[in-house]
Amino acid sequence: MYDYIKGQLTKITAKYIVVEANGLGYMITVANPYSFTDCVNQQVTIYLHQVIREDAQLLFGFHSEEEKDVFLKLISVSGIGPTTALAIVAVDDNRGLVNAIDNSDIKYLMRFPKIGKKTAQQMVLDLAGKFVEAPKEESSKPPKAKQQGNEQLDEAVEALLALGYKATELKKIRAFFEGTSETAEQYIKSALKMLMKG
């Protein structure tokens, strides 16, 4: 098992990033790949969780140990796999998640992709009281230069699809942001907040 990787960030796609360490490029699935935009061709530390399946070995990556801890707690719940847990972690403010679990807010939990009533109830049962503190965003990144809005919006929608959100939900998001000019990361953060409000 791996705990973290230090290396040069060489590539960003809608689903994963690539970190080169000791001459090997590691494909790492992350919640919001575009949150790493400022780190391309720079040294990064990514906290890892490895999943070994019959047909694949997957690496899931996180900005901080706190974010990884939330992910690990989520995948311990019956009915939540790594992809679903990553989609939940992608929501910028995990305090909402912690409050929903501690207050048995099933409706809020059901807003996450692939979380039905039974799984939401299981989350409350298994995780209530297990989060000491909501994860803090570790980085103090400088504001990003704005790029072409439509291209960035396309990348954001592609990343949200990869997290499991439905195309029908994302049509409304796309229409809302059409004509604006933000980075893909900013679109993703704003879209996740909108999706969680319902």
Swiss-Prot record:
SMART domains, alphabetized? HhH1
Instruction: Mention any Pfam family matching this sequence.
Output: RuvA_N
> SUPFAM superfamilies, alphabetically?
DNA helicase RuvA subunit, C-terminal domain, Nucleic acid-binding proteins, RuvA domain 2-like
- The segment annotated Domain III runs over 148-198
Q: Name one GO cellular component term.
A: cytoplasm
The answer, when asked if DNA damage is one of the entry's keywords, is yes
Question: What residue spans carry the region label Domain II?
Answer: 64-142
Q: Which InterPro entries match?
A: DNA_helicase_Holl-junc_RuvA_I, Hlx-hairpin-Hlx_DNA-bd_motif, NA-bd_OB-fold, RuvA, RuvA_2-like, RuvA_C, RuvA_C_sf
Q: What would be an example GO MF term here? A: ATP binding
Q: State whether it acts alone or in a complex, and with which partners, per the record.
A: Homotetramer. Forms an RuvA(8)-RuvB(12)-Holliday junction (HJ) complex. HJ DNA is sandwiched between 2 RuvA tetramers; dsDNA enters through RuvA and exits via RuvB. An RuvB hexamer assembles on each DNA strand where it exits the tetramer. Each RuvB hexamer is contacted by two RuvA subunits (via domain III) on 2 adjacent RuvB subunits; this complex drives branch migration. In the full resolvosome a probable DNA-RuvA(4)-RuvB(12)-RuvC(2) complex forms which resolves the HJ.
Q: Which NCBIfam families match?
A: ruvA
- What name does UniProt use for this protein? Holliday junction branch migration complex subunit RuvA
Please name the source species: Streptococcus equi subsp. zooepidemicus (strain H70)
* Lineage, opening ranks: Bacteria, Bacillati, Bacillota, Bacilli, Lactobacillales
Gene this chain is encoded by: ruvA
